[in-house]
Amino acid sequence: MPRPAYRSRSVRRIKVKTPGGRTVIHYEKRAKGVPKCPITGLPIGGMNKKVYRFGIKIRAPSRPYGGVYSHKVLARALRLAVRK
């Protein structure tokens, strides 16, 4: 029986053949998807592909709400803010 942390389906199972001829199961975290805008669902532009390996300062664009909202949502919000 695998340990409790490995029973979850959020962990990927890979069958590996050992030099001794046995087949064992290795567990690894599933790859995360591209970060998406919560409003439009578009992928956020300017984000590094290796998102979770780097800190937020390195991977996110330097614009306001960079790394959170897509450029279309930001442009719309800025236009509304200027008009008020």
Swiss-Prot record:
The keyword Protein transport does not apply. InterPro entries: Ribosomal_eL34, Ribosomal_eL34_CS, Ribosomal_L34e_arc-type. PROSITE patterns: RIBOSOMAL_L34E. GO terms for cellular component: ribonucleoprotein complex; ribosome. Keywords: Ribonucleoprotein, Ribosomal protein. Pfam families: Ribosomal_L34e. Coiled coil: none annotated. One of its GO terms (biological process) is translation. One of its GO terms (molecular function) is structural constituent of ribosome. Belongs to the eukaryotic ribosomal protein eL34 family. This is Large ribosomal subunit protein eL34. It comes from Pyrobaculum aerophilum (strain ATCC 51768 / DSM 7523 / JCM 9630 / CIP 104966 / NBRC 100827 / IM2).
